[in-house]
Curated annotation (Swiss-Prot):
Organism per entry: Vibrio campbellii (strain ATCC BAA-1116)
Protein name per its UniProtKB record: tRNA (guanine-N(7)-)-methyltransferase
Function: Catalyzes the formation of N(7)-methylguanine at position 46 (m7G46) in tRNA.
GO CC terms: tRNA methyltransferase complex
EC number(s) given by UniProt: 2.1.1.33
Enzyme class at the top of the EC tree: transferase
Pathway: tRNA modification; N(7)-methylguanine-tRNA biosynthesis
Signal peptide start and end residues: none
Pfam families with a match to the protein in the record: Methyltransf_4
Binding sites annotated in the UniProt record for substrate: 147, 180, 217-220
Keyword tRNA processing listed: yes
Catalysed reactions, as listed in the record: guanosine(46) in tRNA + S-adenosyl-L-methionine = N(7)-methylguanosine(46) in tRNA + S-adenosyl-L-homocysteine
Entry's family note: Belongs to the class I-like SAM-binding methyltransferase superfamily. TrmB family.
Active site: residue positions: 143
Length: 239
């Protein structure tokens, strides 16, 4: 995933703000991934267009919508969609081989409640996701930018939290984060505690046990065997 910074200007040409985002990184598709992209994109892919999506039109029903940013190769997202047919899932990933792999797995699993996008997540949120429409926003194992001088590049910042808040359903919507970097977990808690309109739903302390709905990945299982921790965090939109 690559990061870019663009400037936004007003009509007078004065810069209003800097926008940091994460954009599509091209990679080499395998033949299987390319085949899945070609075959499945017409039914499961959503092209970027600066217009708000209508979830009923997208999925053909009014089921709750779960959106994941940065699903990697998509195995856990496909598993979640397969295990919860009563929900609709949409994944945004900038790495095209990951999108192809996800579509291939989804086709093999025979699921119909999953859609994917290959575009900048911030642009999608700003122009395509209706306010107050998401039941859950998932952000699993984002780049930790572990060097201190790079912490400002972490996706979880106050402006990102506010963007998420606007898209979640009031008094219901959940922002679910997971990381295997303790320092990033602490950073997430610090940011979310400052972000207005959110409450941590952990019963004790700041973190929750891994929820059953989040599949245990091979990478995570290996980390457990090596003694590495994983921190799950859930905040609910309250205002």
């Amino acid at each position: 995933m690559s990061e870019v910074t663009t400037n936004e200007y007003n009509e007078d040409g004065k810069m209003i703000r800097k926008i940091r985002s994460f954009v599509r990184r091209e990679g080499r598709l395998t033949k299987g991934q390319e085949n899945a992209m070609n075959e499945c994109w017409p039914t499961m892919g959503i092209d970027y267009k600066a217009e708000l999506l209508d979830w009923k039109e997208v999925f053909g029903n009014d089921n709750p919508v779960v959106l994941e940013i940065g699903f990697g190769m998509g195995a856990s997202l496909v598993e979640m969609a397969k295990n919860a047919p009563e929900k609709n899932f949409i994944g945004i990933e900038v790495h095209s081989p990951g999108v192809g792999a996800c579509l291939a797995d989804a086709r093999e699993a025979g699921i119909t409640n999953l859609r994917v996008m290959c575009h900048d997540a911030v642009e999608v949120f700003e122009h395509m996701i209706p306010n107050g429409s998401l039941a859950t926003l998932q952000l699993f194992f984002p780049d930790p930018w572990h060097k201190k001088r790079h912490h400002k590049r972490r996706i979880v910042q106050l402006e990102f939290a506010e963007m998420v808040r606007q898209k979640l359903i009031l008094n219901e919507g959940i922002f679910h984060m997971a990381t295997d970097w303790e320092n990033y977990a602490e950073h997430m808690i610090e940011i979310m505690n400052q972000a207005p309109g959110f409450d941590n739903i952990a019963e004790e302390g700041d973190f929750i046990p891994r929820p059953e709905e989040r599949p245990l990945t091979k990478f995570e299982a290996r980390g457990h065997r090596l003694g590495h921790g994983v921190w799950d965090i859930k905040f609910k939109r309250t205002a």
